[in-house]
From Swiss-Prot:
Family note: Belongs to the Tango11 family.
Keyword Coiled coil: yes
Annotated keywords: Coiled coil, Cytoplasmic vesicle, Membrane, Mitochondrion, Mitochondrion outer membrane, Peroxisome, Phosphoprotein, Synapse, Transmembrane, Transmembrane helix
Record note on quaternary structure: Homodimer. Interacts with DNM1L. Interacts with C11orf65/MFI; the interaction inhibits MFF interaction with DNM1L.
Name of the protein described by the UniProt record: Mitochondrial fission factor
Species annotation: Mus musculus (Mouse)
């Protein structure tokens, strides 16, 4: 009802202005003075200026003058329709209570080009080392058929020593993997030292020639193959560690949100309890003073 009355009032107000409003014929700057006005009219005839409202206002001559032609941009602006813009009020409070961290997903992450490339590189390294190992073993078999070499003594390998910093890194998968790599490299170096000491020259055709030990080569190629396999496994472990870290971050975030909500509820309960306690003591004090 109020809206209808307001609209009716606005219509009547607009209609009244349109009917009663008049343009004045003269505009006076100073307050009226009879003597001054009489002198001014006697000295200067037709001193007053009649005010007229033009029917239209033309911009730059309306192409009548070449030097002051109508700009084409004005016609383009007037002919181009403008679409109304709709604005939406942003929310006052932004919370994560509905679905926290939508950009983190508990599902298995999609394989990225970097992870796929690292896996492909590890796979190529393993295949290359296996093929080289097979080719060299075949060459060693042919060489053993043509060359007679004495059987080397049994190499005695010392167990790899563990450094004190290796024991501190056993709490994570990366530490265990680094421990395996370091122990493998130390064992490989010890085997090479022992085999270099036991290598002897072999006589062939009256000349002394130092030939490579097939057992030594087999051990070298086997350990290189193991190193390549461990490198490929480290790439896979990196991808698995990233996925597990993401899951742990999501769990920690949710747990933190639950703790924050519990703290807020506990603060509200404490405020209510404090208010009740203070009111109780004030009431008791007032009753005691009245007695």
């Amino acid at each position: 009802m109020a809206e209808i009355s307001r609209i009716q009032y606005e219509m009547e107000y607009t209609e009244g202005i349109s009917q009663r409003m008049r343009v004045p014929e003269k505009l006076k700057v100073a307050p009226p003075n009879a003597d001054l006005e009489q002198e001014f009219q006697d000295g200067v005839p037709n001193a007053s200026v009649i005010m007229q409202v033009p029917e239209r206002i033309v911009v730059t001559g309306n192409n009548e003058d070449i030097s002051f032609s109508r700009p084409a941009d004005l016609d383009l602006i007037q002919s181009t329709p403008f679409k109304p813009l709709a604005l939406k009020t942003p929310p006052r409070v932004l919370t994560l209570s509905e679905r926290p961290l939508d950009f983190l997903d508990l599902e298995r992450p999609l394989p990225t080009p970097q992870s796929e490339e690292s896996r492909a590189v590890g796979r190529l390294k393993r295949e290359r080392s296996m093929s080289e190992n097979a080719v060299r073993q075949n060459g060693q078999l042919v060489r053993n058929d043509s060359i007679v070499t004495p059987s080397p003594p049994q190499a005695r390998v010392c167990p790899p020593h563990m450094l004190p910093e290796d024991g501190a890194n056993l709490s994570s998968a990366r530490g265990i993997l680094s421990l395996i790599q370091s122990s493998t490299r130390r064992a490989y170096q010890q085997i090479l030292d022992v085999l270099d000491e036991n290598r002897r020259p072999v006589l062939r055709g009256g000349s002394a020639a130092a030939t490579s030990n097939p057992h030594h080569d087999n051990v070298r190629y086997g350990i290189s193959n193991l190193d390549a396999a461990i490198e490929g496994a480290s790439d896979d472990m990196t991808v698995v560690d990233a996925a597990s870290l993401r899951r742990q971050i999501i769990k920690l975030n949710r747990r933190l949100q639950l703790l924050e909500e519990e703290n807020k509820e506990r603060a509200k309960r404490e405020m209510v309890m404090y208010s009740i306690t203070v009111a109780f003591w004030l009431l008791n004090s007032w009753l005691w003073f009245r007695r």
